Amino acid sequence: MQCCNQQSSQPKTTTTCPGGVSSCYKKTWRDHRGTIIERGCGCPRVKPGIRLICCKTDECNN
């Protein structure tokens, strides 16, 4: 599984997820800096107020 792992509006980068990981995530939230985007492997739990998208194809979280 290949997932994007760049932060916010940085140039696209990808990572190969460890064995057994079959999903990618994209978390989005706002703070004093503006909209923050975090991407990576897996599908983590998030706090209320954080938007989470999980998907199951290569680089689907761009």
Curated annotation (Swiss-Prot):
Q: Which InterPro entries match?
A: Snake_3FTx, Snake_toxin-like_sf, Snake_toxin_con_site, Toxin_cobra-type
Where on the tree of life does the source sit, at the highest rank? Answer: Eukaryota
Expression tissues:
Expressed by the venom gland.
Cysteine pairings via disulfide bonds = 3-24, 17-41, 43-54, 55-60
Q: Which UniProt keywords apply?
A: Acetylcholine receptor inhibiting toxin, Disulfide bond, Ion channel impairing toxin, Neurotoxin, Postsynaptic neurotoxin, Secreted, Toxin
Molecular function as annotated in GO: acetylcholine receptor inhibitor activity; ion channel regulator activity; toxin activity
Does this UniProt record's set of keywords contain Zinc-finger?
no
**Pfam families documented for this protein:** Toxin_cobra-type
Cellular component, GO annotation: extracellular region
Polar residues bias located where? 1-17
Positions of region (Disordered) = 1-20
Subcellular location(s): the record lists: Secreted
What does the sequence similarity comment in the record state about its family? Belongs to the three-finger toxin family. Short-chain subfamily. Type I alpha-neurotoxin sub-subfamily.
Q: What does this protein do?
A: Binds to muscle nicotinic acetylcholine receptor (nAChR) and inhibit acetylcholine from binding to the receptor, thereby impairing neuromuscular transmission.
Can you name this protein? Answer: Short neurotoxin 1
